[in-house]
Amino acid sequence: MTKITLSLQNFRIQKQEITPLKEKSTEKTSLAKAILAVKNHFNKLSSNLSERFISHKNTESSATHSHRGSASEDRAVLTNKVVKEFMLQTLNDMDIIGNASKDPAYASQTREAILSAVYSKNKDQCCKLLISKGINIAPFLKEIGEAAQNAGLPGATKNDVFTPSGAGANPFITPLVSSANSKYPHMFINQHQQASFKIYAEKIIMTEVAPLFNECVMPTPQQFHLILENIANKYIQNTP
């Protein structure tokens, strides 16, 4: 009978590492927490970026509106400048001094018209104030009439009050303002703009005609204005 001997060396049992169930569960929990943390961080980051984007857009929008407002103001200033330059050029084209140098009658009529306009402006302003306070304007009219007569203005006396024959608005203002209004009608929409350009027209006209009074017995427009203003102040100061 044959005896069989088995060698233990050929039948070794390999030891296998077995991870406990509890340890695997812990790893899954940690992984889930890590994923959740990343997700939360991403959401927070997205929220911050969104807030920054909105803030930037608001700032950009505000800056755009501010820039547009500034640009609008600049355009208004430039347009006013253009209108005034046009008025000045129109006045130069009238060539008041040139025409006056060629025609003594024209020069005399121009001086009378300018001083008569100064008379009318001062008279209207003071009379309006005196009447509003219930003051009799007859003495005032008599005194400024005498001042106008002394200045060399032609006119007529009625009810003991002298009135210049050329009393009225400055004859050069209307054509100057009208030409600018026709050229730039959008700049004469409101009364404030109209008044502003009228004041400017009067200013440049007075500067233009000033040389006509250099060699003349008549007072300059500025001197005549001061004479009438002093008379007006005397009556205004006595009002209650």
Swiss-Prot record:
InterPro entries hit by this protein: SopE, SopE-like_GEF_dom_sf, SopE_GEF_dom, SopE_N_dom
Ranges for region GEF catalytic domain: 78-240
Highest taxon above the source species: Bacteria
SUPFAM superfamilies: SopE-like GEF domain
Main location: secreted
Coiled-coil ranges (or none): none
Impact upon substituting I97R: In strain: SARC9 / s3015
Any one GO CC term of the record: extracellular region
Keywords, comma-separated and alphabetical: GTPase activation, Guanine-nucleotide releasing factor, Secreted, Virulence
Any one Gene Ontology molecular-function term assigned to this protein's record: GTPase activator activity
UniProt signal peptide: none
Pfam families noted in UniProt: SecIII_SopE_N (PF05364), SopE_GEF (PF07487)
Keyword Transport among UniProt keywords: no
Location relative to the cell: Secreted
Recorded consequence of changing S182C: In strain: SARC9 / s3015
A Gene Ontology biological process term: actin cytoskeleton organization
Role of this protein: Activator for both CDC42 and RAC1 by directly engaging these Rho GTPases and acting as potent guanine nucleotide exchange factor (GEF). This activation results in actin cytoskeleton rearrangements and stimulates membrane ruffling, promoting bacterial entry into non-phagocytic cells.
Record's miscellaneous remark: Encoded within a lambda-like prophage region with similarity to GIFSY phages.
Family: Belongs to the GEF (guanine exchange factor) SopE family.
Name of the protein described by the UniProt record: Guanine nucleotide exchange factor SopE
Source organism (scientific name): Salmonella houtenae
Gene this chain is encoded by: sopE
